[in-house]
From Swiss-Prot:
Keywords: ATP-binding, Helicase, Hydrolase, mRNA processing, mRNA splicing, Nucleotide-binding, Nucleus, Phosphoprotein. Residues 103-268 form the Helicase ATP-binding domain. This is Pre-mRNA-splicing factor ATP-dependent RNA helicase PRP43. Residues 1-74 are annotated as: Disordered. It holds the Pfam family HA2_N. GO terms for biological process: maturation of 5.8S rRNA from tricistronic rRNA transcript (SSU-rRNA, 5.8S rRNA, LSU-rRNA); maturation of LSU-rRNA from tricistronic rRNA transcript (SSU-rRNA, 5.8S rRNA, LSU-rRNA); maturation of SSU-rRNA; maturation of SSU-rRNA from tricistronic rRNA transcript (SSU-rRNA, 5.8S rRNA, LSU-rRNA); ribosomal large subunit biogenesis; rRNA processing; spliceosomal complex disassembly. It catalyses: ATP + H2O = ADP + phosphate + H(+). A motif (DEAH box) lies at residues 215-218. Present with 16900 molecules/cell in log phase SD medium. Transmembrane segments: none annotated. InterPro entries: DEAD-box_helicase_OB_fold, DEAD/DEAH_box_helicase_dom, DHX15_DEXHc, DNA/RNA_helicase_DEAH_CS, HA2_WH, Helicase-assoc_dom, Helicase_ATP-bd, Helicase_C-like. It is found in: Nucleus.
Length: 767
């Protein structure tokens, strides 16, 4: 990071310390003087309903007696008629048949592995079985159940709150990044695995919990893998803590071995036979082929809802529009039944996610009404949608890939694994025999799809992970017990990046800046940029830009309306690039004019995504609270000042100095600094001039290498802000190094001239 020279009384020589480092040191001192208040003590109901029962000795019969009573033992209120109806449905789930067997295993072991196919009821029922045995409300503890995805954490918490006849956010709640719907009454908390990891950074023993359930462990997310390694250590220190590892797939022996031969209980799902159909040849346009297949099913097949798997929000929303339009046409022209089409992806607001559980529309003239759910791979195992009889599987999903040599992490549309294909097909056989239409050949399934997806830890940039592990007190990363250890090169890259960001010192120890950066739920690069932004007199603006970078794309560009959408975007465009354009969009969104116009209509007319913008607004507020908590100054430069935009670009360079590209001399495109990758600027950028040097937010791997969300910067800023990274002795020979050498000479000459002038001034003043 860039350095300022700071003199201290203990050190007569100047000590080089970056601005963010100084801010972190001050924040650390202040927090020692004024420690943050700990969380509120838990408050629970106890009117003796559990009297006579012994913790960790509850039988299924005793628990069911409490469930069948008139009074809710967790609230003291009478059960509602709706509760009684739901209880009957719950008792029919496959897990209920094995409640006694589960309890015996749970009571006699500290760690157990539970396998239940999607639809067996494991995610909603097992945590409730645990509550009746743990009695957390009498012990002042909580039960945690982690989910890899936010959507699942929210929707499952809502369902379980209904099942337990309690209010969501009270006895049952959820915690996801930037949203906490729990209270001091909460005894069962559904949360993303990342949120539990953040809690562990503050409380290494997770002392608030008496039982932790890691659900969907087969997904092998980064956070789940780290939690598993961490919990292996915690259980040694906490013999009172119980762990349940839950998986939807039967390859659970690996989990058993990892947890020292933990016992396993498997519960079969309720599945009916599923007929598989393959295409005779490769489908060039899988999206078009998927839409045609859905419409063909609707026109020709018997009653039953359809689940279509696609790769992301844009693709899903496009398909929702097309299927809705063509479905209406089928109703009018062919007399087909009505069609309700619902999207499902991570950034969808909770009330819209819930619509997927609505019943299908009524039949019309004897033709069945149908519900179509178009989802990312979240519907593979995380959520169960009743009524699905037909699955359309194009065979793709978005997967993160990372190349440590060129430090590029990208989301790529890639073929799914055989395990995923089987999970998808299984969704069709939940309520009756179903059909799965695979939009690829049988030969491709047998020969081209890998058996299992690679764990996320093997295909990710590990900077955030290493910072988390350091904050968790794990210094020996080489010997940390990963289920699948990442490549040493990936680990080295992460350590190197964190060292350049001054989050780790040269010995690999956490610095005050690293400790402070780890408090922000952001990529370390963004956290460091935000912490140091006050020095550039623009922390308010950087706060906004960071929030805007943390949400899905705010610009909407419909296929039929590209020209209008581009014209609307140009209203906000700033010639220096996309980051300041995002700032302009946010300011316009928050303006009185937009609200007087009607904010939803304003967003529609300007081709902006209201959901993304309101999410950015929420994230900004939360980050602002963190800034205030750690006494980080919130400031801005006068908008009329000629320095206003330069200050913002300098602050951006202080975070993105490792993501820089230079225009190629005498050739088209750019070349990335240090890694020498040929790249093009993404067509979506608004950069209004041929900038020589740019920072970029992401590297997009498609048929060509693109850099996206770019802003022009001056190379002298980079040398000044990040001298360690721009130590030219570490650069390969070539155009980038030559240019930087020339700029460095120029900067050094200017500095010498300044120093010469200052010496003359001091001589005159002495005279």
């Amino acid at each position: 990071m860039g350095s300022k020279r700071r003199f201290s009384s203990e050190h007569p020589d100047p000590v080089e310390t970056s601005i963010p480092e100084q801010a972190a040191e001050i924040a650390e001192e202040l927090s020692k003087q004024h420690p943050l208040p700990s969380e509120e003590p838990l408050v629970h109901h106890d009117a003796g309903e559990f009297k006579g029962l012994q913790r960790h000795h509850t039988s299924a019969e005793e628990a069911q007696k409490l469930e069948d009573g008139k009074i809710n033992p967790f609230t003291g209120r009478e059960f509602t008629p709706k509760y009684v109806d739901i209880l009957k449905i719950r008792r029919e789930l496959p897990v209920h048949a094995q409640r006694d067997e589960f309890l015996k295993l749970y009571q006699n072991n500290q760690i157990m592995v539970f396998v239940g196919e999607t639809g067996s009821g494991k995610t909603t029922q097992i945590p409730q079985f645990v509550l009746f045995d743990e009695m957390p409300h009498l012990e002042n503890t909580q039960v945690a159940c982690t989910q890899p995805r936010r959507v699942a954490a929210m929707s499952v918490a809502q369902r379980v709150a209904e099942e337990m006849d309690v209010k969501l956010g009270e006895e049952v709640g959820y915690s996801i990044r930037f949203e906490n719907k729990t209270s001091n009454k909460t005894i069962l908390k559904y949360m993303t695995d990342g949120m539990l990891l953040r809690e562990a950074m503050e409380d290494h023993d997770l002392s608030r919990y008496s039982c932790i359930i890691l659900d969907e462990a087969h997904e092998r997310t980064l956070a789940t893998d780290i939690l598993m390694g961490l919990l292996k250590q915690v259980v040694k220190r906490r013999p009172d803590l119980k762990i349940i590892i839950m998986s939807a797939t039967l390859d659970a022996e690996k989990f058993q071995r990892y947890f020292n031969d933990a016992p396993l209980l498997a519960v079969p799902g309720r599945t009916y036979p599923v007929e598989l159909y393959y295409t005779p040849e490769f489908q060039r346009d899988y999206l078009d082929s998927a839409i045609r297949t859905v419409l063909q099913i609707h026109a020709t097949e018997e009653a039953g809802d359809i689940l279509l798997f696609l790769t992301g929000e844009d693709e899903i929303e496009d398909a929702v529009r097309k299927i809705s339009l063509e479905g209406d046409q089928l109703v009018r022209e062919e007399g087909c039944g009505p069609l309700s089409v619902y999207p499902l992806y991570g950034s969808l607001p909770p009330h819209q996610q819930q619509r997927i559980f609505e019943p299908a529309p009524e039949s019309h003239n004897g033709r069945p009404g149908r519900k179509v759910v178009i989802s990312t791979n979240i519907a593979e195992t995380s959520l169960t949608i009743d009524g699905i009889v037909y699955v359309v599987d194009p065979g793709f999903s978005k997967q993160k890939v990372y190349n440590p040599r060129i430090r590029v992490e990208s989301l790529l549309v890639s073929p799914i694994s055989k395990a995923s294909a089987q999970q998808r097909a299984g969704r069709a056989g939940r309520t009756r025999p179903g059909k799965c239409f695979r939009l690829y050949t049988e030969e491709a399934f047998q020969k081209e799809l890998i058996e299992q997806s690679y764990p996320e830890i093997l295909r990710s940039n590990l900077s955030s992970t290493v910072l988390e592990l350091k904050k968790l007190g794990i210094d020996d990363l080489v010997h940390f017990d990963f289920m699948d250890p990442p490549a040493p090169e990936t680990m080295m890259r992460a350590l190197e990046e964190l060292n350049y960001l001054a989050c780790l010192d040269d010995e690999g120890n956490l610095t005050p800046l690293g400790r402070l950066a780890s408090q922000f739920p952001l990529d370390p690069m963004l956290a460091v940029m935000l912490i140091g932004s006050f020095e550039f007199q623009c922390s308010q603006e950087i706060l906004t830009i960071v929030a805007m970078l943390s949400v899905p794309n705010v610009f909407i560009r419909p296929t039929k309306d590209k020209k209008r959408a581009d014209d609307a975007k140009n209203i906000f465009a700033h010639p220096d690039g996309d980051h300041i354009t995002l700032l302009n969009v946010y300011h316009a969104f928050k303006s009185d004019e937009a609200y007087e116009y009607g904010i939803h209509k304003w967003c529609r007319d300007h081709y902006l995504n209201y959901r993304s913008l309101s999410a950015a607004d929420n994230i900004r507020s939360q980050l602002e609270r963190l800034m205030n908590r750690y006494n980080l100054e919130l400031n801005t430069t006068d908008y009329e000042s000629p320095k206003y935009f330069d200050n913002i670009r300098k602050a951006l360079a202080s975070g993105f100095f490792m993501q820089v590209a230079k225009k190629r001399s005498g050739a088209k495109g750019y070349i990335t600094v240090k890694d020498n990758q040929d790249v093009l600027i993404h067509p979506s950028t608004v950069l209004g001039h041929d900038a020589e040097w740019v920072i970029y937010n992401e590297f997009v791997l498609t048929s060509k290498n693109y850099i996206r969300t770019v802003t022009s910067v001056r190379p002298e800023w980079l040398i000044e802000i990040a001298p360690a990274y721009y130590d030219l002795s570490n650069f390969q020979k070539g155009d980038v190094k030559l240019s930087l050498e020339r700029i460095k000479e120029k900067v050094d000459r200017l500095n010498e001239l300044k120093q010469g002038k200052n010496k003359k001034k001091s001589k005159h003043s002495k005279k």
